[in-house]
Amino acid sequence: MTRREDGRLDDELRPLVITRGFTEHPAGSVLIEFGHTKVMCTASVTEGVPRWRKGSGLGWLTAEYAMLPSATHTRSDRESVKGRLSGRTQEISRLIGRSLRACIDLAALGENTIAVDCDVLQADGGTRTAAITGAFVALADAVTYLSAAGKLSDPRPLSCAIAAVSVGVVDGRIRVDLPYEEDARAEVDMNVVATDTGTLVEVQGTGEGATFPRSTLDKLLDAALAACDKLFAAQREALKLPYPGVLPEGPPPPKAFGS
């Protein structure tokens, strides 16, 4: 099989590193690295829910995505300076939130909110898929934190794992985990979000300058799901280690009647 410019096979992921406990304060904090792409993903727990959610007894999960000004070769202005979020930033933020809400029982949170923040430290393609994959690990740690604090009505509110990967057709070949150099010239570009039970959460695909047949779509999905299986294995391996911070002490047990 012909190797790519970075030496990988078509179905090979970039070197993947997941570092838990990257920062101290959030309930979940992860640095995820897909090759040269590096994203910090944090999951913070706050009491209360948005106004439209109050009184429902349900929790909420929201997500925000941003790129540091120097994440790419050319520095870009912060969107806070511009006074508005770009359409791309809003789209990716919503994608991350939708993806993570697909795996969690919000009723188990009570009226608490998990806020996920994904900040791209360095970009070389696949930032949204890296953000989703890392954010799930941060979310899992946040759930551990909430469980220790006695704030979960169900101790296992996560129904599945979530991961995402980019796939595409480059030089007429189906390839996974595209770096920027391949993404910029792909004939077909697709992002796939999946669960470890084999189901799909979201598929975003575009023919860049040409159409493509259904058979190519099927092959792209097969390649993406096979790549996601490797990501799930890496997530499980990372989460085998103990919680990387200090867990809160839960509420004391109720007193016996009459004591």
Swiss-Prot record:
One GO BP: tRNA processing
Provide the catalytic activity annotation: tRNA(n+1) + phosphate = tRNA(n) + a ribonucleoside 5'-diphosphate
Q: Which UniProt keywords apply?
A: Nucleotidyltransferase, RNA-binding, rRNA processing, Transferase, tRNA processing, tRNA-binding
Q: Which positions bind phosphate?
A: R88, G126, T127, R128
- EC number(s) in its UniProt entry? 2.7.7.56
> Pfam family example for this protein?
RNase_PH_C
GO MF annotations for this entry? 3'-5'-RNA exonuclease activity; tRNA binding; tRNA nucleotidyltransferase activity
Record keywords: tRNA-binding included? yes
Q: Cite the CDD domains for this sequence.
A: RNase_PH_bact (cd11362)
Name the source's superkingdom.
Bacteria
> Which top EC class is named for this enzyme in its record?
transferase
Q: How does it assemble?
A: Homohexameric ring arranged as a trimer of dimers.
Q: What does the protein in this record do? A: Phosphorolytic 3'-5' exoribonuclease that plays an important role in tRNA 3'-end maturation. Removes nucleotide residues following the 3'-CCA terminus of tRNAs; can also add nucleotides to the ends of RNA molecules by using nucleoside diphosphates as substrates, but this may not be physiologically important. Probably plays a role in initiation of 16S rRNA degradation (leading to ribosome degradation) during starvation.
Family classification:
Belongs to the RNase PH family.
Q: Which HAMAP family match?
A: RNase_PH
Q: What is this protein called?
A: Ribonuclease PH
